[in-house]
Amino acid sequence: MAYGALTLVWVVLWRFPVLMADDRFFAIASELPRGQQTWAVIEKMFDDCWRLINGRLADGFGTMLFALGNTALRLAMALFYVALSAILWCYLRLSAEALRRPLPRLSLGTGSGAAWICWSLAAIWPFTLIGLSTGVAGESVMLMAAVWNYMFPLALLLFALYPLFRRWAGRPMPWWAELLSVPLVYVSFLMHELVTVAGAVLVAVALLTARSRVWTVPVGLITASAIVGVYVKFTAPGLRARTETYQGIDPVLLTSLRAKAVSAAMALNLWPQRDLKLLLVLALALGLAVHMAWRSGRFSTSRARLLLATLSLMFLSVLAWLVANMHFIREQRRVGTTDLDAINNLLGEAIPVLAAAGGFVVCTLVVVFLLPKGFLSPLTTGTLLAAFLTTGAVAYSSSPHYAWVHRTFYMPGILAVLVVVMICADVLSSAGEATRPETRTTSLLAPVLLVLVGLHSLVVTGTQLAANWAAWRNVEHQVAAVKAGQQDTVTIPITLPCSDVMWYFNGSNLERTAHQWRIYYGLDRDVPVRVRVPETVHSCPIQ
């Protein structure tokens, strides 16, 4: 029943999103109305994405999903989120069992409160992320292209690695189930380069931290599949082509060490700008873990002081990151954001940003490794490492042309919020062993607060999506009137009431936008489609 309710929520939400520019690129690939596709174009899209565009197998699924029809497409978007929440709940239980403090099963009886809170965290994490990350609702969570690029590959990866982690936890699945995961691991590693990085980290964690014998023939095949997947993914021709997109530009301006440092700082500036609350919540979650470990008497006073000092430095590094970011942006605006030569002279401003970000990472890892052994699950630590490594990968491969695009950090953002969820689950399972009632009460504070943040964001996001769809209905009525011969022109609004659930709605080329909508709605070429500021501008009902 719980998953039925969760599915219903996602199905209702996915009735409303209007296609963004990235979505429309795939929707009109076959130049047929309403996202219809030919098999030849689907095959070509897979081939082009792998060889020419970005080296991602995931993007090839865009046209395939549109070919299913609008209803099935939106149902698939909903089910991808439900699937990831379900597999996350399985990992939370598996992680607790590996630490010998299992979470109880979901039930309506007494003693299952902690389990329900953990399940709620796993179910509502996308909305918790929305509450902690500015603009991520429209830029990533409710953007179809982001769902099949990030959510689907991550859900597939976790599903494929589940037999390996069952063996890691000492509860191996049948050998045939482990063998079936071998091709799935390989395919998941080809989907998206950031998923590949995360997958490599998780496989290493499973192999290096297992308490019992883990090496078997199926595990060896899974490991080999992962290694081959990493090699094939990072030698994909499209991945290199993506870094060579900008023709006519001096390569030194993009690939020199100075350029890499400045571009990385530009990209990392997005964290204090857009994800400051997420950084602080991660630090607070670790602070709660330190407090709970100290209350349980599991480390000495000297270690407690060291942890407290490191936590303080962790918060100070976030503040330093924010200050360095403000200075960098001020100088960037002074020299002009489009002048690559001038931007590359901002090395002096970039170094403090990189140092502050690096300080936050180091302090976080020190806190994690100073905690008593077994307090946090190795899976939590591995996910944290994956979040940091994927962030580093995005920063390293960034270019001044798209360093401002927050969506590039969607995967690290997902992993970061999952780390927070896992820390809360570890704390709750640890509190189950505590004898003091106040200890158990303290362990509930952060998880319950995160659930409330998620519920609030769910209400806000749903209301904003519905408001945008209500405004977009006018376009649907215009299309119907044109096809009925009742009017000659279709006017597309240049924006919709609630910008928080929009990203790259029209793009920079309005003529291309009009062309895309003309194809999508199956309008004749001689029908004028204009992208304009609407005559009646509706305000967003909730912010």
What function would you assign to each model-found segment?
Residues 11-75, 144, 193-407:
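Transmembrane catalytic cores of multi-pass membrane glycosyltransferases
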Residues 1-10, 121-127, 180-182, 220-227, ...:
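Alpha-helical transmembrane segments
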Residues 84-95, 153-168, 200-208, 284-290, ...:
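Transmembrane alpha-helical segments
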Residues 2-57, 63, 67-119, 213-220, ...:
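Intrinsically disordered, polar/acidic, low-complexity terminal segments
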Residues 47, 70-87, 126-130, 146-155, ...:
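Individual alpha-helical transmembrane segments in multi-pass integral membrane proteins
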Residues 166-186, 214-220:
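Short hydrophobic alpha-helices at membrane interfaces in multi-pass membrane enzymes
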Residues 114-165, 348-363, 388-423:
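Membrane-interface micro-motifs in multi-pass membrane enzymes
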Residues 370-377, 395-464:
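C-terminal structural cap/anchor segments
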